[in-house]
Amino acid sequence: NLIVVGYWKDPAAHCRWLRSAPVNDWWASPDRLNDGLGYFREISAPRTEQFETLYAFQDNLPGVGAVMDATSGEIEEHGYWGSMRDRFPISQTDWMQPTSELQVISGDPAKGGRVVVRGHDNLTLIRSGQDWVEAGEEERALYFNEMLPPLQDGMNFLRDEGQALGCYSNRFVRNIDLDGNLLDIAYDIGHWRSLDKLERWAESHPT
């Protein structure tokens, strides 16, 4: 599977792009149903109070950091159980429980074809990455021999059996360059029913 991830600073600009003729016509074309491929478009638009991100550095930020105007500097909400939740502004007054269920708006997932699924409020999206581009031999050996195997096991478990725990989907991916060559960067992208479900898995599940 190939995934392209894009971050938009302005929701209106994203909407205009999405509705532009080249994009909309390609997506809506009946040819997409006969390409022999499956296409997925996942759009998430968290409100500011529902969003947090954390970096160990302040320059050349990857991911959503590339479109942020500024960072908050050093923080204390890190390195202890529950720190992720504490970084959400809304967590001061809200437990962030899901308000409803996933809804199939159109189509039938069992039959394939075009299907539209609507999320619910407080659905949790996590993207957590690893970058060993500048790692030395000792650090690489530590990552590949000790850190990656249990990480891969956990990610595969969530991909294959995570729904019973509240994980809607989970993918562990490697970045590639424009020529398709693997880069020394990887990340997990997971969709969960709630932050609480994610916390419970991270806290107590064997994987």
Identify the role of each PLM range.
Residues 1-2, 7-25, 29-171, 177:
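Short S/T/G/P-rich N-terminal loop/turn motif that feeds into the first structured element of a domain
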Residues 7, 188-192:
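Extended catalytic/binding region for NAD+/ADP-ribose chemistry, centered on the ART fold
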Residues 10-20, 194-206:
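Short amphipathic alpha-helices within nucleic acid-binding modules
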Residues 176-189, 197-207:
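C-terminal functional regions that serve as terminal interaction/effector modules
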